[in-house]
Amino acid sequence: SRSRLSDSRGLESCGLENLDLKCETLERKQPKPTWRQRLVTFLIAVTLLLSALWLLLAIWYQYGVSSVLTWLATIAIVGILAALLSTRYWDTVTKILQSDSLSNKKSISKNTATKLLIGIYGTVWLVGLGWFFSIEPKQDREWMAEVDQRVSYERDANNPDLITLTNVRNFDWQTEEDATKHWDTRTIDLSKLSGVDVTNSYWMGPLIAHTLVSFRFEDDRPLAFSFEIRKEDGESFSALAGFFRRYELSLIAAEERDIIYTRSNARGEQVYLFPISNLQQHEVRSLFESYLTAADDLNAKPAWYNTLLSNCTNIIFYMARIVSGDRLPWDYRIWVSGWLPNYLYDVGMLDAAPEKNNQPWSMNTWYERTHI
């Protein structure tokens, strides 16, 4: 019996030594990930993190940070994502493995968990995506006074050049927030259109500006149009929130004494007015008609403001490009609204020599001369 016990211990010792040797051999044979594999892993991790961040921001801006639903969704999404990312560090081979079968079981367990977590996260994210795109803009919220009316119009049956606009804003501003409200009705004659001015109002540094378009008339005062967010009572603007269906889009028709004064005086913004050159009369009229069409569209069906795709500047560019027969080239400055005047200068929409002495103006001179 002593001999059998000795033999058994010898075999056990030999087995352990062989297992250790096998583990060491597997470790040595384990290939190191290539730079391509590392890059793919990195891109997958970044994609997961960005997709989760997008969904969380959408929930936060729709329901508010203090909402219980926001926090429950945050905990669930972060938990699933953390568990999914942690599977990368699951041990596939360890020195404490007792057999090859257990090693295979370990590997299968990791793969199963990874697939399960990917399925759960993908389902949650797709449900969130569907929820986000199902959010509809509304017309019947508690709006701030400056955007609570929608411009509409009627065309004279006998003279189609005569347009009667209803709800033209003509406020008397005392402070940035206080004003005496006036919503006027005004009739204009499209045959008397004489030109276009573009106003840039800088409120957040040199890169970001609010853009307005004013139409000049031969025998009447200008009329301005402005695409803006339709703020609710107590609401403030956030560029980041503008990506997440937080604000409806509003088109304001206003007198310049209202819509420019409130920015240059009441709010203390830096405002510049640029007269546009090289536009034919039919192009000016077509651009005005585009605003009327936009008013019809927004009255029929509200739309979302988007910081990148449908803001105060690029909507104007989309319309202007159509009426000019695609004469205006695409440019990154369409999305960097503070540099829009430089774009207009480069494409010849600002007169290079606006004075009678024909002395050319640089862009710096334009900024100096057009500051309000």
Protein language model regions, located:
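Internal/C-terminal transmembrane anchor helices
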Residues: 110-135
